[in-house]
Amino acid sequence: MALRLAEQGYRVRIFERYPRPGGLARVLEVGGEPLEAFYHHLFTSDRAAVALAEELGVGDLLEWLPSKMGIWTEGRLWDFGTPVSLLRFRPLNPVDKLRFVLATLRLQYTGRYQQFENVSAVEWIRRTQGERVWRTVWGPLFHQKFADRAEQVAMVWLWGKLRLRGRSRSESGMGERLGYMRGSFARLITALESRITAAGGQLVLSEPVRRIERTEGRFQVVTRSGAHPADQVVVAAPVPDHIEIAGHLLDPQELRRLQDLHATAAICTVLELNRSLTPFYWLNIADPEMPFGGLIEHTNYIPRDRYDGRHILYISNYLFPDHPLYRATKEEVLGSYLPALQRVNPSFDRSWILASHHFHADYAQPVVTLGYREQIPEMRTSVPGLYLCCMAQIFPEDRGMNYAIVYGDRAARLVLDDLRRNGSGDPAPEPS
């Protein structure tokens, strides 16, 4: 978004909360190699991300590699995600498997998502796939991700996820190829930052916005370093942050609609191990007794020699901010995870852990409820010159890096259209 505005000659200043740019794609270092704090990959259908990488001269760094999916259920690991693995998946009987496959294919090949907007995901799955499939596969995953809001989730959300994943499968359906950038997606972010600054834009790191004020038709973006004037402001932040810094400017009805939106938070623990935990890249945990929802073993997808031989394991856990584990220390969280990791691999021992890292995201997954389209906040707010570009607007697709780019471009076009329509000669939009 900032790049598109700067390319048109507008003065752009970005206020970034974190010491490094990238948001959920920010990085740490493991074995001297950058690594995302939260696991990231691309699907083959993520055309916007691929196009941006090509535009910025880093497209040759993208690698498309096979990945392997598994599931933990009924106390053991199962290969899961290919026709052969499904045939061998004993927790479901042949009729269950057939219903599961037919329903999944319907979602992957149906383009008309509108039919799922006002349908409960829980009810649809139970009706089309049966109670055993719900209880064995989907139920634990939904409840781990959405807790007591699982019953509120619309089927269109699952349609978006399965349709996206289906497009990354080989024609035979025997595997999924995912995209990763050699040197991490920090290479894409660094290239984007360089292009923005070359176009005259400015990026200010570790400078969270505290408040946005508006006086006599101009904005003041207030940070710890002072008040910064702007003619237009784009808030590229989660809905709660938008409410906190700009809610007092909004129309009361618009503010109430924003307050009615909900999202789960997430904690992501990254372990550097001296050996592999499982044979899978992506392991869904379909067990309500387990304290996390997914194990993503990055080095079962990307060669571990890039990380000085270390095995990298992400432990994914979606929860709401009032969950006790969300405010727990890194050691407390890890302590609660260790017995579960030993269940997954009985040989696992704490001595396998060479280092650990712990990250929070207050706003990680919007809760897409029935009729969500009517709840989506507009990019143009009720305040002229104030815009919102956020995860909650991504629909019907699920959130991800590709759609952050798509919606950022969309917001930039909207701002540019308004500037041209209003005849502004030299505005200074300041995304934050």
What are these language model-derived features?
Residues 1-10, 199:
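A short, Lys/Arg-enriched amphipathic alpha-helix followed by its capping loop at the start of a domain
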Residues 6-30:
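Glycine-rich FAD pyrophosphate-binding loop
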Residues 8, 207-313, 317-327, 331, ...:
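Mid-domain catalytic core of redox enzymes
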Residues 31-114:
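Dinucleotide-binding Rossmann-like beta1-alpha1 core, especially the glycine-rich loop
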Residues 48-64, 68-80, 128-134, 196-205, ...:
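Feature captures the FAD/FMN-dependent oxidoreductase FAD-binding
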Residues 92, 101-212, 230:
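Active-site/ligand-binding neighborhood in enzyme catalytic cores
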Residues 302-308, 361-388, 392-395:
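FAD-binding beta-loop-beta segment adjacent to the flavin cofactor pocket
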Residues 392-415:
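A conserved FAD-binding loop/helix module that cradles the flavin
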